[in-house]
Amino acid sequence: MGTASIKLNKKTALFLATALMGLLSCAKNEAGENDFEPPKLTVLSPQEGQVFANGDTIHIVAEATDNAALHEYAWGIYDTAGVIVPSQFGLVHDEKRYTIRGSHVVGGIATTTLWTVWVHSDDERDNYDDYEINIIVSP
């Protein structure tokens, strides 16, 4: 059984991801009612410009911290055409610190190309932080 991919440009993909997170946020509690400080993301892996080949695993590791309470996170990998290679969303409630983890095995790459890893975290008041890392994938 094969996998399907959806071709979206990056702005459309980010809009859809944000809309999904907005829908998920309907169940938020009132924690952090006066919180105007966004979470802080520290991406530990991958590194900017890191090179991956077919068969390699891209490990996404990021630390999200917030002064009040984290709410959710997302990560995705986009190719140069804006196609989402993989992505993941998750809910994190009432935590001030959370380690975001994900992975993707590179496969089917015929020519060297640039991919973008996107990591996102928001808190209970919809304050957010986004981070992008460019990586190189090759056959």
Pin down the residues of each PLM region.
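C-terminal motif of bacterial Sec signal peptides marking the signal peptidase cleavage site
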Residues: G22-S25
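Aromatic sugar-binding surface patches on proteins
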Residues: D94-S103
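Extracellular acidic, Ser/Thr/Pro-rich low-complexity tracts
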Residues: Q50, I60-A68, S121-D123
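Solvent-exposed loop/turn segments flanking beta-strands in beta-repeat/beta-sandwich domains
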Residues: N67-D79
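Proline/serine/threonine-rich low-complexity linkers at boundaries of modular beta-sandwich domains
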Residues: E30-L41
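C-terminal edge beta-strand
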Residues: Y131-V137
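Surface-exposed, short loops/turns at beta-strand junctions within beta-sandwich domains
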Residues: V106-T113
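Bacterial N-terminal signal peptides that target proteins for export
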Residues: G2-L14
